[in-house]
């Protein structure tokens, strides 16, 4: 990435900005999303779209609803008792919350990488091969070997593990485990990759490696990342959405959000007046 043009997290002003340049057609289009935990409303009427081959960052203070919203995109909220999602989330024109949609197949199209690396208690090889096996993506051992190698290469891990594929996935370092989890998501041929604070448990060196990987993966996938780090959002994303108290306050090109926000609440958050 060209660091000379990297947006900064300080010095935001409130002068009107130009209209955001056009982006690719949305891979996912969210319309009037509302999320409830029992009687408590966590997300309020959020409409937001995510373009293909780009990184969109969701930022905001703790408890603002960004992770809850992220989980809507592959129906992970279905697994939470008393959680209810209303509104439409369209993928290829079809509402993913329709009862005809198999959530298991949906999650193969919309993969997820969690805050803490969570490799399966299996070998490095089987961590990657598990998904393609259950989804019938390989017709032979040779096909499976090819998927494993390609996924590990795309995650930047192949050269580090190619001679110990039968070692436990848990034997890897934290940063390697997170790249293994990214490779596992890639292996089932997703169209979208969701990342929920993927670097929060990693050291700076491992974080830099994951950020480089995200920049490479965006050439192939629609990526949505939740991050508590405004600096990380500025480094890795092309578009940024700012959430506060379950509301979408502002959405725009990352450079505009960080240097010329339209909303005062966005400026106050970016400049550290609250957080």
Curated annotation (Swiss-Prot):
GO terms for cellular component: plasma membrane. Transmembrane segments: none annotated. InterPro entries: AAA+_ATPase (IPR003593), ABC_transporter-like_ATP-bd (IPR003439), ABC_transporter-like_CS (IPR017871), P-loop_NTPase (IPR027417), PstB-like (IPR005670). SUPFAM superfamilies: P-loop containing nucleoside triphosphate hydrolases. One of its GO terms (molecular function) is ATPase-coupled phosphate ion transmembrane transporter activity. SMART domains: AAA. ATP binds at residues 60-67. Keywords: ATP-binding, Cell inner membrane, Cell membrane, Membrane, Nucleotide-binding, Phosphate transport, Translocase, Transport. GO terms for biological process: phosphate ion transmembrane transport. Residues 28-270 form the ABC transporter domain. Its EC number is 7.3.2.1. It is found in: Cell inner membrane. It catalyses: phosphate(out) + ATP + H2O = ADP + 2 phosphate(in) + H(+). It is a peripheral membrane protein. Part of the ABC transporter complex PstSACB involved in phosphate import. Responsible for energy coupling to the transport system. PANTHER family: ABC TRANSPORTER I FAMILY MEMBER 17. The complex is composed of two ATP-binding proteins (PstB), two transmembrane proteins (PstC and PstA) and a solute-binding protein (PstS). Belongs to the ABC transporter superfamily. Phosphate importer (TC 3.A.1.7) family. This is Phosphate import ATP-binding protein PstB. It comes from Hyphomonas neptunium (strain ATCC 15444). The lineage of its organism: Bacteria, Pseudomonadati, Pseudomonadota, Alphaproteobacteria, Hyphomonadales. The gene is pstB.
């Amino acid at each position: 990435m060209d660091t000379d043009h990297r947006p900064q997290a300080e010095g935001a002003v409130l002068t009107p900005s130009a209209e955001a340049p056009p982006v690719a057609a949305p891979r996912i289009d969210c319309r009037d999303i509302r999320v409830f935990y029992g009687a408590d409303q966590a997300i309020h009427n959020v409409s937001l779209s995510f373009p293909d081959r780009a990184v969109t960052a969701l930022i905001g203070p703790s408890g603002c609803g960004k992770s809850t919203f992220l989980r809507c995109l592959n129906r992970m909220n279905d697994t939470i008792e008393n959680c209810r999602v209303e509104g439409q989330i369209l993928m290829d024109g079809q509402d993913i919350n329709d009862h005809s949609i198999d959530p298991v197949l949906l999650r193969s199209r919309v993969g997820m990488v969690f805050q803490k690396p969570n490799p399966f208690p299996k070998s490095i090889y089987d961590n990657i091969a598990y998904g393609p096996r259950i989804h019938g993506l390989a017709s032979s051992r040779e096909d499976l070997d090819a998927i494993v190698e390609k996924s590990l290469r795309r995650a930047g891990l192949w050269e580090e593990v190619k001679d110990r594929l039968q070692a436990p996935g848990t034997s890897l370092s934290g940063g390697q485990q997170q790249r293994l989890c990214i490779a596992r998501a890639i292996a089932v041929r997703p169209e979208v990759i969701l990342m929920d604070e993927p670097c929060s448990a990693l050291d700076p060196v491992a974080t830099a490696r994951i950020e480089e990987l995200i920049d490479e993966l965006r050439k192939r996938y629609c990526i949505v990342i939740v991050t508590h780090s405004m600096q990380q959002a500025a480094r890795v994303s092309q578009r940024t959405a700012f959430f506060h108290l379950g509301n979408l306050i502002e959405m725009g090109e990352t450079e505009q959000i960080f240097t010329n926000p339209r909303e005062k609440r966005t400026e106050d958050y970016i400049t550290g007046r609250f957080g």
